[in-house]
């Protein structure tokens, strides 16, 4: 997918790196992806989805995988014990990274013999604290905080069917609810669609000068609360899908295509895989990049400002249909 707002850069002769200010050392003007436009953000989320599926393949026949959603209960819905322990939605209605961190500690403590890995996002819903749609509220800019995560090498053995969503079966798990403690939970299957759902947090995140005013909540008493922006965290050491890459690198390079079980074969290799190849075989990576430049030159008409704007409008309309209903 193209960047719709590419930046102008130059390749440094001595280092081979990219600079954004011309100098005597620099040569060969080139366009560099901005990293912030819709095209870049969709690429970023798709690359994460690829890696999530690749990581899940490593555990499919051992511990299995789970796609989970963790939500908060209202303070008014608490039992006495839950109220005393603070297991309800924060007064600020903000995401809280520590809540998920503590959840993972409790989960791993419950299953000490399992090496449970994860990829998770924190995001906000569409219903605000004043019980209306965010888009219809004159005060709120975000909705109810909640979390989505893919758990690798773990499934729950007490799943209860609670419904379906767009043909996907959804479950509850008393064990998961007990470990989470803060409210309702859902469990689903790990698919390329659910992986992309977790990774598309970036489409909602506001950056730059607009962020300061966007991530503010006003409670019923008129107090201001500054909110944690949407975010992701994941298991490291090794990185997500590192072991899969080590086994199947020849399926990606030098063809420069990425096979994703259940989803097909994709052009556009995750940058993480490129970094791994650069460490092992920098000459192959340079050759692949040169071939990409040849392809871009041969299809230059597809990358004119006018053409990019047309493609942007189409992609924006398509992305609006990616409803976050899980």
Where are the regions a protein language model picked out?
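Long non-globular sequence segments
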Residues: 1-21, 266-326
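Intrinsic-disorder/low-complexity loop/linker signature
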Residues: 8, 16-17, 25, 71, ...
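Conserved His + Asp/Glu catalytic blocks
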Residues: 126-132, 139-145, 151-289
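DNA replication initiation on ssDNA origins
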Residues: 1-53, 293
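Short beta-strand element of the conserved SAM-dependent methyltransferase core
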Residues: 70, 149-153, 310
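Residues in well-ordered beta-strands of folded domains
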Residues: 38, 69, 119-122, 186-188, ...
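Signature for HUH/AEP ssDNA processing cores
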Residues: 43-140
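A structural signal for well-ordered alpha-helical segments within the folded catalytic domains
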Residues: 35, 97-101, 196
């Amino acid at each position: 997918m193209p960047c719709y707002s590419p930046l102008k850069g130059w390749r440094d002769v001595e280092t081979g790196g990219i600079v954004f200010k011309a100098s005597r050392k620099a040569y060969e003007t080139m366009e560099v992806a901005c990293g912030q436009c819709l095209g870049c953000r969709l690429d970023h989320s798709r690359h994460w989805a690829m890696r999530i599926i690749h990581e899940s393949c490593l555990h499919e026949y051992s511990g299995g995988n789970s796609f989970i959603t963790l939500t908060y209960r209202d303070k008014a819905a608490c039992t006495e014990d839950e109220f005393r322990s603070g297991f309800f939605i924060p007064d600020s209605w903000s995401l809280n990274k520590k809540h998920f961190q503590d959840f993972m500690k409790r989960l791993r403590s419950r299953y000490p013999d399992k090496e449970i890995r994860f990829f998770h996002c924190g995001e906000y819903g569409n219903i605000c604290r004043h019980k209306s749609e965010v888009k219809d509220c004159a005060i709120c800019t975000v909705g109810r905080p909640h979390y989505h995560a893919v758990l690798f090498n773990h499934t729950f053995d007490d799943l209860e069917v609670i419904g379906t969503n767009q043909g996907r079966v959804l479950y509850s798990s008393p064990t998961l609810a007990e470990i989470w403690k803060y409210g309702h939970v859902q469990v689903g299957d790990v698919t390329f669609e659910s992986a992309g759902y977790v990774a598309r947090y970036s489409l909602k995140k506001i950056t730059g000068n607009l962020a300061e005013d966007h991530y503010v909540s006003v409670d019923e008493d008129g107090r201001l609360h500054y909110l944690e922006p949407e975010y992701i965290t994941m298991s490291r050491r090794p990185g997500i899908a590192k072991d899969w890459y080590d086994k199947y690198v020849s399926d990606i390079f030098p063809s420069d295509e990425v096979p994703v079980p259940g989803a097909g074969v994709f052009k556009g290799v995750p940058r993480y895989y490129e970094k791994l190849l650069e460490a092992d075989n920098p000459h192959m990576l340079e050759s692949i990049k040169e071939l990409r430049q040849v392809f871009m030159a041969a299809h230059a008409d597809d990358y004119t400002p006018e053409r990019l704007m047309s493609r942007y409008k189409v992609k924006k309309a398509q992305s609006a249909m990616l409803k976050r209903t899980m």
